[in-house]
Curated annotation (Swiss-Prot):
Modified residues (Pyrrolidone carboxylic acid): 7
Swiss-Prot/TrEMBL keywords: Cell membrane, Chromophore, Hydrogen ion transport, Ion transport, Membrane, Photoreceptor protein, Pyrrolidone carboxylic acid, Receptor, Retinal protein, Sensory transduction, Transmembrane, Transmembrane helix, Transport
Protein name (record): Bacteriorhodopsin-I
BP GO terms, sorted: phototransduction; proton transmembrane transport
Protein topology in the membrane: Multi-pass membrane protein
Location in or out of the cell: Cell membrane
Function according to Swiss-Prot or TrEMBL: Light-driven proton pump. The chromophore contains 78% all-trans- and 22% 13-cis-retinal in the dark and 90% all-trans- and 10% 13-cis-retinal upon illumination with >500 nm light.
Organism: Haloquadratum walsbyi (strain DSM 16790 / HBSQ001)
Keyword Transport tagged: yes
Note: Different protein aggregation states can be observed, leading to variations in the absorbance maxima.
Site (Primary proton acceptor): 93
A GO cellular component entry from the record: plasma membrane
PTM section of the record: The covalent binding of retinal to the apoprotein, bacterioopsin, generates bacteriorhodopsin.
Length: 254
């Protein structure tokens, strides 16, 4: 990573712009890989997963490119006199890409439209309150909305584990295994985001914008490209999966 940073610096890209450039490249490469991988896909269900999963890094690439050129950046002057550089385009990205991630894992789990819709609604509330926490100038209000957003995230993750976990319980072993891997990616990466906000420039300012941008880039690549790679290369999507586990009702009927 440090070698890449040095090479980017030699091209005139410095500071957090290095990580924004690498984030753009990473998302574009992920998108192109998913497109190439899905060119010969004919099955309607597989196509649905490919379309959703391709859109995720495509949107993220546009967001990272806008931040790289400074279009997705603004300054917020806090009431205590501190000026914070805010990449609002990051929240625009999340407002579109996180529902698509939840749609992907919801369709994989076989969750109902109602449950997927409920989780997407919670997700949208989480992102919007997080954006309010970032843009408001009153310091106490920032932490209040951060707390609301974080509580929403905890409820979202619980809903994902409990409700989607129940929906996938009767699926075949390959589907359950893929679901568990994707669920764990969401649990780990999403849980780090509010912590990164809190210790970063938008919160306590324990880290600078350079390190904060690097952390968000790594999280985004894992949560989007890594997620998509595991999903689209799984036997649960590409076929050849094992037989579903009989439900309790089916077992009783036998």
């Amino acid at each position: 990573m440090s070698q890449l940073a040095l090479q980017m610096s030699s091209l005139g890209v410095e500071g957090e712009g290095i990580w924004l450039a690498l984030g753009t490249i990473g998302m574009l490469l992920g998108m192109l890989y998913f497109i190439a991988d899905g060119l010969d896909v004919q099955d309607p269900r597989q196509k649905e997963f490919y379309v959703i999963t391709i859109l995720i890094p495509a949107i993220a690439a546009a967001s990272y490119l806008s931040m790289f050129f400074g279009f997705g950046l603004t300054e917020v002057s806090l009431a205590n006199g501190r000026v914070v550089d805010v990449y609002w385009a990051r929240y625009a990205d999340w407002l579109f890409t996180t529902p698509l991630l939840l749609l992907d894992i919801g369709l994989l789990a076989g969750a109902s439209q109602r449950d997927i819709g409920a989780l997407v609604g919670i997700d949208a509330f989480m992102i919007v309150t997080g954006l309010v926490a970032t843009l408001t100038k009153v310091v106490v209000a920032r932490y209040a909305f951060w707390t609301i957003s974080t509580i929403s995230m905890v409820f979202l993750l619980y809903y994902l584990v409990a409700v989607f976990g129940e929906a996938v319980s009767d699926a075949d072993e390959d589907t359950r295994s893929t679901f568990n891997a994707l669920r764990n990616i969401i649990l780990v990466t999403w849980a780090i985001y509010p912590v990164a906000w809190l210790v970063g420039t938008e919160g306590l300012a324990l880290t600078g914008l350079y390190g904060e941008t690097l952390l968000f880039m790594v999280l985004d690549l894992v949560a989007k490209v890594g997620f998509g790679f595991i999903l689209l290369r799984s036997r649960a999507i590409m076929g050849g999966g094992s037989e579903p586990t009989p439900s309790a009702q089916e077992t009783a009927a036998d």
